[in-house]
Amino acid sequence: MLYQQISQNKQGTVVLLVVFFALLALIGASAGYLLLDNYAMGLVLALVIGVIYATSMIFQSTSLVMSMNNAREVTEKEAPGFFHIVEDMAMVAQIPMPRVFIIEDPSLNAFATGSSPQNAAVAATTGLLEVMNREELEGVIGHEISHIRNYDIRISTIAVALASAVTVISSIGGRMLWYGGGSRRQRDDGDDDVLRIITLLLSLLSLLLAPLVASLIQLAISRQREYLADASSVELTRNPQGMIKALEKLQLSQPMKHPVDDASAALYINEPRKKRSFSSLFSTHPPIEERIERLKNM
């Protein structure tokens, strides 16, 4: 059951990424049709923008991400218990030892960052380290190490970059149309051809809806990788109860004291900001109740 769930989560992410690239291609083709009367050029430009966004974000410095989250790097001497758990989990996962950081915050939370296992880092709040016992900490750190081993940070970064690219292309296309852009043929032909009108309307609709759809796909990928990291943590620790107990404590945690931006929020094991009342479709994290239920059903 454990390996089946891991496989299903990975397959789900692949499907979502394929849909994401299809959406990027669609919005590019739509913008190309409306502005240049050239589907292919719009599609190519959209994919180029997406690749540039993704590449620039993937190589964002680990130290910069940690600095943005008020995390301080610690040595084995400063935090031996935490350090050794990270070391043990990294050894089991067969990845290089990540750098270790602590965030001075009473809330219960942790996250990992780094585009690859070779430049990764793990951070935990002081609240988490004080409240959780070793069994629970192993579950949490196993979760974060799994994010590193599964290249989740890279996948999530690509998803954020693609969502940003879709939004930028949609915004540029909309503004150009509003201020009198559009292809010469669409302005001058006066063609009442039904197919052309339908294509025009569908292209306009895709420009309007694409940013929302892109955001929903990006958030779905984030939630999918959280489920995968939970299951992968159990694979590393061989102890589902440790992860379940940790999630039960995380469920009671208060929001973090310092502001957390959207990109950083998706990295944490638990939503670091005040819980929102709207649909889970717009959340970076699955409901903790569902995460616990999945672990119990393994």
From Swiss-Prot:
InterPro entries, A to Z: HtpX_protease, Pept_M48_protease_HtpX, Peptidase_M48
Cell location: Cell membrane
Keywords, ordered alphabetically: Cell membrane, Hydrolase, Membrane, Metal-binding, Metalloprotease, Protease, Transmembrane, Transmembrane helix, Zinc
EC number: 3.4.24.-
A Pfam family: Peptidase_M48
Membrane topology of this protein: Multi-pass membrane protein
Recorded GO MF terms: metalloendopeptidase activity; zinc ion binding
Binding site for Zn(2+): H143, H147, E226
Cofactor note: Binds 1 zinc ion per subunit.
Residues forming the catalytic site: E144
GO annotations of cellular component type: plasma membrane
Stretches that traverse the bilayer: 14-34, 39-59, 158-178, 197-217
GO BP: proteolysis
CDD domains: M48B_Htpx_like (cd07340)
Cofactor(s) of this protein: Zn(2+)
Main subcellular location: membrane
Family: Belongs to the peptidase M48B family.
Name of the protein this chain belongs to: Protease HtpX homolog
